[in-house]
Amino acid sequence: LEDKLQDGTLRYGIEKLSGKRTIVFQVSGTIHLNGDLKIKNGDLTIAGQTAPGDGICLAGYPVFLEADNVIVRFMRFRMGNKEDVSADGADAFGGRYHRNIMIDHCSMSWCTDECVSFYQNENFTLQWCLISESLRLGGHTKGPHGYGGIWGGMKASFHHNLLAHHDSRNPRLGPGVNSTKENEIVDMRNNVIYNWCGNSCYGGEAMHVNIVNNFYKPGPATPTGTSKRGRIIAIDKKVSDSDKKSYPAIFDTWGDFFIQGNVVDDGQINGAADYDRCMKATKDNWEYGV
């Protein structure tokens, strides 16, 4: 479980070895990373399910996926907010600009930017993952910043994931800055989104997106008495944000969406108005949930 660049460690198998390989584990526990872990040599499978007991947890630093042909299964990512990690842009697990990637049955939590951000990839799948408890006050220079993730890609699938206890970006759907609307094809279905605060899902500029059969459950942090409680997605396009930051031209293009079968379940504990808002969004996703 030591994080050293020596034979037998996870870092050695990821950073030193190359070619087609599968990393298996003979022990279980937490690997306290000594620095960022960057997956740069592709043709790799990390088989976390081979670890005995409670499996493998990577803690302390971000993990970056920077290679093609990668499978990661049954791993836990707990970045935290160590003082020597820049909080801005630090995701528990993320990657861009690569292809043929599958992330399966993993858990990502306690990030200072987003828990899991994968966009601008090609042939990508994120499935059966638990994405929870981003750090709202984790040291980001913008202040409160507990976000789930940025999702997108060219033929990208996000299904059967749980996003829970994030302020916003549940997820934020984002295109590649150098991409085109024709290439951005994303399928988001059978996910559970629970207890958002500032926003649930939003964005989708210049993307073709399916949002199908997802389950939205407002929680204690979700504002009452507002449209956010019954919101499935806030479709957006941007030229600049509140900080006057300019966006690439692709962000000034409306996306195309197929939205159907999503359920917003509020229960009746927060009063008739909120219950009615969520029931309407479930009955007509487009009219009341967008």
Locate the predicted segments by residue.
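Acidic glycine-/aspartate-rich tracts in secreted/extracellular proteins
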Residues: E2-K4, R21, S28-T30, T50-G53, ...
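Extracellular beta-strand-rich solenoid/capping regions of secreted or surface-exposed proteins
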Residues: D7-G19, T30-A47, D54-R73, M79-R99, ...
